[in-house]
Amino acid sequence: MAVTPISLTPGVLAEALVDLGAIEHNVRLLCEQARGAQVMAVVKADGYGHGAVQTARAALAAGAAELGVATVDEALALRAAGISAPVLAWLHPPGIDFRPALLAGVQIGLSSQRQLDELLTAVRDTGRTATVTVKVDTGLNRNGVPPAQYPSMLTALRRAVAEQAIVPRGLMSHMVYADQPANPVNDVQAQRFTDMLAQAREQGVRFEVAHLSNSSATMSRPDLAFDMVRPGIAVYGLSPVPELGDMGLVPAMTVKCTVALVKSIRAGESVSYGHTWTAQRDTNLALLPVGYADGIFRSLGGRLQVSINGRRRPGVGRICMDQFVVDLGPGRPDVAEGDEAILFGPGSNGEPTAQDWADLLGTIHYEVVTSPRGRITRTYREAHTVES
């Protein structure tokens, strides 16, 4: 697998470069792992920080059959961009207006009787039949119809089908252990899901597709594929089970900036607010023009590393709102103002990765890639740079 060298876009101070070729590679791999089941690529939260429209197009080009988002507004943004593929939205607060979704052909995920009632109001107002997926709670105790309320939900669905108000497209649930494919709770959830699918059939509600698998299960539990899988983080090349390595996935995002300033300081001089770092010898510093307002976590001060000219350099001192400092070491500096600094990327050239940041922060790489903002401009490399 070949990845072309990274270079900063001219005129851009800092950027999150998204390699659409990596997205396509990852989705092709997920399609292979799905073993005949369809793939719904999840592009919620603006494509996990990668850009929902661009990543959706890349995922569809690579073989994804459908798209998944959290909110109706996210689905409508895809429609506004000209994406006509099936889109499912499943997170709805009280009082939501489902009419624009119905008019745009967006599929609606339902987790309660209240949501169904509000949807049926929109059906009457628009004259459009709603295509629905019922989300059931199999143990996460978050979004989804609880088992105790499921029988009455099925009764209401059956009545709505008889009135030609809805088409029952799918049954879905969400897994508790996103990064532990062997956890026995996964099997408990799968059995509950299977039972609820059978219960629907017994009550005369027949769903066209059922889907439970997240990224982890798609990559490692083919027995949980049902009719469709619903990967999220793996679409973007981040391993759903970091302990198992990259699993053949290629991280799509690289965050980088220009070196704004290079300067020398003497031994004993200190850096940034609070002087938390003091030079032990004469050294050179590079100033990078991004900070915590741009998604560079303040808690990484004095802990992160940055790759400049093929070498990792330690960050020193506190990270500020819009800048931080790295130590280039003594002697004649081998870094010049205007050089490229890579904060994290795929790691193929030795640069830090999103997983490295997650490990330092005690969090997950999902949080890292959804954090770049502010003055970090999102840019794209077209889908011809990664080869399977």
From Swiss-Prot:
Its cofactor is pyridoxal 5'-phosphate. Keywords: Isomerase, Pyridoxal phosphate. GO terms for cellular component: cytosol. It is an enzyme of class 5 (isomerase). Pathway: Amino-acid biosynthesis; D-alanine biosynthesis; D-alanine from L-alanine: step 1/1. GO terms for biological process: D-alanine biosynthetic process; peptidoglycan biosynthetic process. The modification N6-(pyridoxal phosphate)lysine is found at K44. Substrate binds at R142, M321. InterPro entries: Ala_racemase, Ala_racemase/Decarboxylase_C, Ala_racemase_C, Ala_racemase_N, Ala_racemase_pyridoxalP-BS, PLP-binding_barrel. SUPFAM superfamilies: Alanine racemase C-terminal domain-like (SSF50621), PLP-binding barrel (SSF51419). GO terms for molecular function: alanine racemase activity; pyridoxal phosphate binding. Disulfide bonds: none annotated. Its EC number is 5.1.1.1. Belongs to the alanine racemase family. NCBIfam families: alr. This is Alanine racemase. It comes from Mycobacterium avium (strain 104). The gene is alr.
